[in-house]
Amino acid sequence: MPSPNEKLAESLDVLKAIQEGNQRVFRSDDLSRVHRERLVDNGFLQEVMKGWLISSSPDAQAGEGTPWHASFWEFCARYCDERFGDQWHLSPEQSLFLHGERTVIPDQLVVHSPKATNNDIKLLFGTTLYDLKVAEMPPPAALTVREGLRLFTAAAALVRVPESFFQLYPLEAQVVMASLADASDLLRLLLNGGHSAKAGYLAKAFRQTGRGELADEILRAMKGAGYDVRESSPFEAGQIFPKPSRPTAPIVSRVEMLWESMRGKVLAGFPKAPGLPADKEPYLRFVDEIYPTDAYHSLSIEGYSVTPALVERVRQGGWDPENDAGDRRNRDALAARGYWQAFQLVKKEVEKVIAGENPAALARAAHNDWYREMFQPCVTAGLLEPGSLAGYRNIPVYLRGSRYVPPRWEAVREAMPAFFDLLEKEPEPSVRAVLGHWLFGYVHPYSDGNGRMARFLMNAMLASGGYPWTVIRIVDRKSYLSALDRASIEMDIHPFTTFIVRRVQWRLERHDLKFPAPKESFDLGRDMVFFYGRDGETWVRCAISREALDDHFHGDGKDKLKVFRANRQHIEQEVRRKYLAGDTELDGSILIHSDDLPDAEQPEEASQPAEPDGGSPEGIRGSAEDRSRAGAEESRELSTAPGDETEESEKT
């Protein structure tokens, strides 16, 4: 009798057989009930509605919308074909969105058909499909089919949308207008329909956006046919974007207009650039110091299980795929090694940037090398084909947990040169950093690694203004991704700018931590040793867990204070490293867990703590209670306040 695994394998073979051309959408009767239920139960298929299924993944988390967003347009096309045959089309508004490379999954998709019943069909994750009954289909020449979707042509959609569309969606309207080679298709529709008012505002719109020759052609043709046409702008004040001088691919216009519309908002919220450092050595030394923290957080944001110990092992050359089978197979070790290799190349470019070379030109020339170094270990290990290092993606990609869908892979080849042109023309380092990071992720040129690449690019651009290397922390992942989503879906760059400013500001304020107070205590209830550092006039509460002392400093079964004192210098270095990166707890304190530490050996002799400088602290970074009682001897949560003369023994 076949085992459960053998039965599942049989069902997967059946599924593979019907997935021709990467098909993701299926009717229930495409598979037998047994295979269908087995694949649904094991997470390989997901039901959309009765009779319809989509491909899914057992790795998808409960409530995750990525499989649905990846299948949305294919589902809508196949569902409408099954129900309406060829008697359906999308609305003119949605047609313009798709022509203009607006790829966000809509909450509601409106489908027009003579066979419709004016019904709002509930789909997955809050999306709906509304079938709107219309009297008849438009002329065949007004429609085009793109990836299975029946759209109005760009010209037909511009004529059919109401004038209010131009105020509500000025970017989409102008992107599509910029893509038209001439006015012939528009004029045919305007003349045949007698649309003199539409001709007037379309002519004015073309004139306002730098296509005066098209505006003149529309006016001459309409007036020659006897129509009284008067120009009037369909846009509101401040809605006109850069003027293209020639027909431009939609994705290129979109990237250019997004940049222009957002750069002022970035400038308004960003601190003034410090300027290139006169002495580049301290700057580069800090980049080296921050690497372990940067690698840990950047890789963790992408879902890799990477510890500081692994990062340190890779940095010290302990990664050995030729002789260590575990390193060849370990996905996390491969990612850490790739990050280390890419980081070295980025650092070389940063050195050129702070020496005064053009940062955008350097990034344009080097970014594919960064990418190849990042994934070279996976190719060496046989987990990726060598061709995966060729460059930009040739497949669609989807973002986990987001309604935003990156541009079609065919558009990436046009988008990236335009992106780097904008980066080179931009005079402000802050704009290069913020919009460079966001738009790189918006285009998503690679099949993987785009987040890490965007953060590398951001830091290279920050260096061009003398801003410090900035770490995006794993603890901020939710707000970080949410801010990116706001920019990509709602075209609101303010949250992302504010987020980056907060991270940059920490280093601009030159926070640093010193350890002048030798007093420490062990809190049995919390299983931690507490001690203090000082940032200027502010005392910062620091702690290391019992687990960290046991795992990394041979503290199991020993007096924790003695173990701490014997390794104090090493522990203080790790605390300072976290503090420099702004990797603090919510209350401003620093806590060292076992996962924060690379492996360390117990030194033979205890390091000597610094002598206390005396005096009570004026402020303590820690809980609100700690700050209000700074220096109080009775605090049971903290160690004895810095400067106290009473020796604290280990509490057991």
Describe the predicted segments one by one:
Residues 154, 446, 496, 593-595, ...:
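Compositionally biased, intrinsically disordered low-complexity segments
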Residues 513-613, 619-620, 627, 634, ...:
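Extended, alpha-helix-rich binding/interface surfaces that flank or overlap catalytic cores
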Residues 53-56:
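S4-like RNA-binding module at protein N-termini
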Residues 35:
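Non-catalytic DNA-binding core/recognition domains of DNA-processing enzymes
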Residues 325, 448-451, 564, 617, ...:
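General helical secondary-structure elements
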Residues 1-29, 40-50, 60-521:
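FIC/Doc superfamily catalytic core
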